[in-house]
């Protein structure tokens, strides 16, 4: 049944958990053709955060993508097809006021997706990188309830920069982009113009 789905809890900071997720999906539905690396956390704002906090954000926002690619891409190359979708952020193209760890890891996630595309694109592996701005999820408002001004500023900066989209609207944009196999997926079109301004300002 093409509409069937299962929910599996997994800690993406654990390679074996991701491997188990892939194996469960394959057991239920057959080979994995499309993988969304979508987990993300913000991390504490500002400088001076503990190295353990940096490690946690790196594990979820970046290394989880690397782990999944290590598990899936060799098989995709062997059979000549597969699709890896990485959720980064507009912060991966611009920057994020507030959490340095979030901004750095989203830049890195974008870079890893681009590397995957350049390296394996001619071997049948397609890659897209989703870089939304404000989306109406709890993650967006994490800084609003922060006990620091910098954390609250991060939320205000994102919500003030453009429309806050509903998750369903973002999903529609993603589905259309995947049909056309676009690498860069921008649910907020204004992000592209901001990115161009950023490049021109250096």
Residue ranges of predicted features:
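Residue(s) in the substrate-gating loop at a strand-loop-helix junction
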Residues: 89
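Active-site loop-to-helix junction immediately N-terminal to the catalytic Tyr of the SDR YXXXK motif
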Residues: 49, 95-103, 115
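Substrate-binding pocket helix/loop in short-chain dehydrogenase/reductase
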Residues: 45-58
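Active-site helix of classical SDR
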Residues: 69, 105
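Conserved NAD(P)H cofactor-binding loop of Rossmann-fold oxidoreductase domains
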Residues: 38-43
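SDR active-site lid
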Residues: 118-189
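The beta1-alpha1 cofactor-binding region of Rossmann-like NAD(H)/NADP(H)-dependent oxidoreductases
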Residues: 9-20, 51
């Amino acid at each position: 049944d093409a509409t069937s789905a299962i929910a599996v809890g997994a800690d993406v900071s654990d390679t074996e958990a991701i491997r188990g997720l892939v194996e469960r999906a394959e057991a239920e539905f057959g080979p994995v053709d499309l993988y969304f690396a979508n987990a993300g956390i913000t991390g504490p704002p500002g400088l001076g955060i503990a190295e353990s906090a940096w490690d946690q954000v790196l594990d979820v926002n970046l290394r989880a993508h690397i782990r999944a690619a290590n598990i899936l891409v060799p098989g995709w190359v062997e059979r000549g097809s597969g699709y890896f979708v990485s959720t980064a952020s507009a912060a991966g193209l611009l920057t994020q006021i507030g959490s340095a760890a979030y901004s750095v890891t989203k830049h890195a996630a974008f870079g890893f997706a681009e590397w995957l595309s350049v390296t394996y694109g001619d071997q049948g592996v397609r890659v897209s990188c989703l870089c939304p701005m404000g989306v109406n999820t709890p993650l967006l408002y994490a800084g609003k309830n922060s006990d620091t001004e910098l954390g609250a500023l991060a939320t205000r900066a994102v919500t003030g920069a453009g429309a806050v989209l509903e998750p369903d609207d973002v999903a529609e944009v993603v589905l259309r982009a995947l049909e056309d196999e676009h690498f860069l997926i921008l649910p907020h079109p204004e992000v592209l113009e901001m990115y161009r301004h950023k490049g021109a300002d250096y």
